[in-house]
């Protein structure tokens, strides 16, 4: 079937290889370097020039006013301008912190102050690397395939599984079996490390290959490497067993391989149609970009500019010869995907990212499962830093090394985040001055640094990460990732690959006190700190000291807001729907037993049922057996169902027993539609400061309310903490 590519492809005359597109520049190289040098010298001058409080406030105020004035203008130049102003203000702050605020004080002041300065330097480096990473996102578009299908390469599709239930794997396999690709050039393989007879029988019924091995060495990476030896396709497409591909996946992905012989990897987004724990427990699904959207919506496009696209383990196609050249999927770390991309790039291969969602999967169901997944990612990036550090060795350009450095450093935010959550308590409890400066001077330097950086990120990240939500995500995960990352740095061989649980249910709402325990402790410390601060305010005289008290009280209050949102995330809401509903608006036909034919449109669907809106509402009795007509490639097929509910013309139906071909048809006409996820990808409104602030405050208030309810329940029934999934320490 011919493919209509979701994004307009470039005309043939304008096709450029990935390499030439990355290096394209309107300025000669010498002139570019001259401009960079001039900018660096100007920045050094701006950073180092001494200013008093008034001059500093005027300088930073002017830059902030300019940024406010231009922030809504279009064009990349505006973003580069805002980044430059943000760096100027932030560099002034860091320079001031290092040269003016680490003066003589007590040993305790100096040690605690050094810890805070270290956390701030870490945040500054991440800010600079983040700006570099998204300096000029490539925004690559799909390239059409040749009209002659004989020129299309052969592809092996791998779906690795271990302990996931067949109900999760089933839809992915059926979707893979209807991918639009010449029949003689595609082979589907289910790689079952669970060695289950039920899966073997299912594969035989569907007509795909069932592949297993005698051991589970190296987990998912070993599973894929073992399967590589049993097949011979030119390329390998890999899907996690819950990632359902669309029919057009390969036609969107493969064009670039035929236009660039050095291209080894095409990665596409991981889109999740079910809410993750943050979205479900904070009721932000569809309202706030989830934790992963920044990476797949912006950072990977930025990486692509520098030929530093990461392989993400699923929704990707890899060139077989390139993969075999680097020894298969990397097995030395628990983030085998990112490490494999690094090995390919070291060998001079190019990698590409297409921000076109052509597969969708299930998000983690519980906060504890989500945390366990992030622990593995954090440990794996720390292992890469030790075992195959991108800053060292041959084969990478400086730009690639910087992208990997940002990715590795990102997962070390645990310690800095905990420092931020406790730093004001040093003064409120003990009177320690961690910053040797007046509150006014701190505000004059720190506030512009924070405001300018947030305003810039508001412009750059707006559709993919709303303001302050990064604080909530990092606060929630900080306690759990700082130890694995530090341990992996010391001994990268410790730890194991843990499979992320998918397809589970939350039978009843409950408060996961086990996962929230560190944050309950931190919240208690901050509450006591607030009390101590108020007492200091009452009993300590002197306007200078009062300013310092107010500054630390405000900081502590902000920390309490973040901790409240974190605690709300640990309050698991009930999730009893095993098959998640997906919005879909397409024509369908409802056939009644008496012969009536009712034209309708779908509202949403799942593997178990569908909601439809009748064109002409009429009462339909619940329990009535019906047939639902769904079209695929212009042909309609009916599927058996029963009416469950009729609400003013919106009818809910439940599918009944279907044949394998009917089930395959259902998947092909719903989950596997080429455009099914496009309307839901990157469609969030641009962020607004007050809206984000209100959402975070609402989440925090919900957390305090749920904590209060949990305390009351515990007092009545006795405290019995629950944990949904054991965490790997």
UniProtKB/Swiss-Prot annotation:
Identify which cofactors the protein needs according to its UniProt entry.
Mg(2+)
Reactions catalysed, semicolon-separated, are: [(1->4)-beta-D-glucosyl](n) + UDP-alpha-D-glucose = [(1->4)-beta-D-glucosyl](n+1) + UDP + H(+)
Q: What is the top-level taxon of the source organism?
A: Bacteria
Its subcellular locations are: Cell inner membrane
- EC number of this enzyme: 2.4.1.12
Which residues are involved in binding substrate? Answer: 240, 242
What InterPro entries would the database entry show?
Answer: Cell_synth_A, Cellulose_synth, Glyco_trans_2-like, Glycosyltr_2/OpgH_subfam, Nucleotide-diphossugar_trans, PilZ_domain
* Protein name per Swiss-Prot or TrEMBL: Cellulose synthase catalytic subunit [UDP-forming]
């Amino acid at each position: 079937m011919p493919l209509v590519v979701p994004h307009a492809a470039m005309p043939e005359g304008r096709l450029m290889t990935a390499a030439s597109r990355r290096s394209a520049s309107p300025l000669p190289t010498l002139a570019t370097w001259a401009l960079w040098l001039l900018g660096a010298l100007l920045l050094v001058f701006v950073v180092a020039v001494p200013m008093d409080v008034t001059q500093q406030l005027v300088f930073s105020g002017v830059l902030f006013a300019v940024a406010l004035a231009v922030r809504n203008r279009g064009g990349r130049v505006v973003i580069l301008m805002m980044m430059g102003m943000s760096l100027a203000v932030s560099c002034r702050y860091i320079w001031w912190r290092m040269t003016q605020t680490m003066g003589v004080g007590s040993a305790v002041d100096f040690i605690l102050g050094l810890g805070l300065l270290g956390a701030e330097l870490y945040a500054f480096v991440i800010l600079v690397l983040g700006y570099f990473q998204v300096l000029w996102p490539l925004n690559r578009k799909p390239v059409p395939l040749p009209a002659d299908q004989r020129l299309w390469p052969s592809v092996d599709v791998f779906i690795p599984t271990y302990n996931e239930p067949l109900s999760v794997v089933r839809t992915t396999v059926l979707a893979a079996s209807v991918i639009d690709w010449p029949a003689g050039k595609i082979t589907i393989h289910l790689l079952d490390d669970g060695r289950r007879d039920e899966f073997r029988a299912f594969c035989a019924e569907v007509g795909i290959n069932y592949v297993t091995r005698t051991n589970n060495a190296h987990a998912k990476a070993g599973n894929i490497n073992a399967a590589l030896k049993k097949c011979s396709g030119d390329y390998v497409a890999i899907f996690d067993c819950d990632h359902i591909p669309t029919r057009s996946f390969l036609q969107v992905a493969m064009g670039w391989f035929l236009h660039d012989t050095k291209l080894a990897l095409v990665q596409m987004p991981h889109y999740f149609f079910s809410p993750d724990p943050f979205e479900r427990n904070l009721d932000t699904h569809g309202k706030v970009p989830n934790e992963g959207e920044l990476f797949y919506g912006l950072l990977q496009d930025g990486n692509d500019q520098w030929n530093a696209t990461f392989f993400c383990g699923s929704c990707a196609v890899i060139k077989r010869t390139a993969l075999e050249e680097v020894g298969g999927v990397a097995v030395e770390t628990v983030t085998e995907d990112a490490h494999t991309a690094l090995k390919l790039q070291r060998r001079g291969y190019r990698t590409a990212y297409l921000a076109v969602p052509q597969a969708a999967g299930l998000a983690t169901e519980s906060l504890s499962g989500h945390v366990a997944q992030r622990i593995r990612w954090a440990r794996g990036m720390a292992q890469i830093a030790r075992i195959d550090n991108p800053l060292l060795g041959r084969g990478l350009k400086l730009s690639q090394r910087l992208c990997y450095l940002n990715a590795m450093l990102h997962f070390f935010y645990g310690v800095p985040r905990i420092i931020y959550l406790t730093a004001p308590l040093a003064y409120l409890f003990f009177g320690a001055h961690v910053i040797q400066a007046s509150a006014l001077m701190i505000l004059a330097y720190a506030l512009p640094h924070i405001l300018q950086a947030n305003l810039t990120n508001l412009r750059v990240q707006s559709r993919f990460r709303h303001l302050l939500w990064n604080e909530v995500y990092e606060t929630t995960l900080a306690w759990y990732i700082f130890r694995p990352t530090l341990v992996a740095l010391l001994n990268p061989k410790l730890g194991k690959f843990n499979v992320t649980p998918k397809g589970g249910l939350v039978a009843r709402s409950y408060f996961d006190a086990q996962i929230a325990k560190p944050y309950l402790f931190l919240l208690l410390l901050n509450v006591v700190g607030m009390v101590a601060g108020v007492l200091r305010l009452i009993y300590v005289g002197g306007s200078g000291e009062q300013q310092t008290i107010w500054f630390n009280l405000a900081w502590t209050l902000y920390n309490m807001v973040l901790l409240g949102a974190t605690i709300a995330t640990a309050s698991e809401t009930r999730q009893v729907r095993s098959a998640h509903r997906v919005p879909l608006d397409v024509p369908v036909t409802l056939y009644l037993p008496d012969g009536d034919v009712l034209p309708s449109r779908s509202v949403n669907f799942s593997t178990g049922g569908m909601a439809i809106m009748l064109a002409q509402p009429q009462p339909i009795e619940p329990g009535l057996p019906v047939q639902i007509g769904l079209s695929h490639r212009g042909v309609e097929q009916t599927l058996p169902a029963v009416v469950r509910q009729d609400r003013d013309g919106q009818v809910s139906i439940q599918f009944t027993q279907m044949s394998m071909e009917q089930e395959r048809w259902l998947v092909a006409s719903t989950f596997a539609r080429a455009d099914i996820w496009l309307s839901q990808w990157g469609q969030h409104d641009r962020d607004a400061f007050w809206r984000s602030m209100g959402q975070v405050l609402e989440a925090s208030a919900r957390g305090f309310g749920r904590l209060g309810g949990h305390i009351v329940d515990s007092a009545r029934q006795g405290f019995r903490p629950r944990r949904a999934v054991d965490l790997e320490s």
